[in-house]
């Protein structure tokens, strides 16, 4: 059995196959997932798993260089947005790498998911709780 935090086989495969600049989306239960994009559906019920739990596990297993969120996330759901920012800051401290945080409109965010390698759907039911991670390199 794996010892690391990430036990889901689909997510493990996704992380193992990420190349530099590939994008993955972690989303709430309501974000529309485009046809043709790989869907990894973790949602069990409202709030399970949570957005921030999923973010933490994904960050523990993968190196990112940037994140993209909808501007509306910070405006409508500031507490969860700040929790995401705190996780990104913690990741910067652990890795010594500066991570970019880009804000776009929700409509632009939804369009951007079309080029994600995969969309990971959580059980989160907080409005605009979505992030696109851009894969980095460990060196």
Swiss-Prot record:
EC number: 5.4.99.62
One Pfam family, short name: RbsD_FucU
Record keyword Cytoplasm present: yes
Domain of life where this protein originates: Bacteria
Pathway noted in the entry: Carbohydrate metabolism; D-ribose degradation; D-ribose 5-phosphate from beta-D-ribopyranose: step 1/2
Location of the protein in the cell: Cytoplasm
Enzyme class name: isomerase
Active-site residue list: 20 (proton donor)
Keyword Isomerase assigned: yes
Binding site for substrate: 28, 106, 128-130
SUPFAM superfamilies: RbsD-like (SSF102546)
Keywords: Carbohydrate metabolism, Cytoplasm, Isomerase
GO cellular component, as recorded: cytosol
PANTHER family: D-RIBOSE PYRANASE
Function of the molecule: Catalyzes the interconversion of beta-pyran and beta-furan forms of D-ribose.
Protein name: D-ribose pyranase
């Amino acid at each position: 059995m794996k010892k690391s935090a990430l036990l889901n086989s689909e997510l493990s495969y996704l992380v193992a196959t990420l190349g530099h600049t590939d994008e993955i989306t972690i989303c709430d239960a309501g974000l529309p997932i485009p046809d043709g994009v790989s869907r990894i559906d973790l949602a069990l019920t409202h709030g399970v798993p949570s957005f921030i739990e999923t973010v933490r596990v994904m960050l523990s297993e993968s190196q990112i260089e940037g994140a993209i969120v909808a501007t509306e996330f910070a405006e409508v759901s500031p507490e969860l947005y700040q929790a995401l920012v705190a996780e990104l800051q913690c990741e910067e401290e652990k890795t010594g790498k500066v991570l970019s945080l880009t804000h776009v409109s929700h409509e632009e965010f939804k369009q951007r998911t079309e080029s994600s390698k995969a969309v990971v759907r959580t059980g989160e039911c907080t409005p605009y709780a979505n992030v696109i991670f851009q894969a980095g390199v460990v060196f």
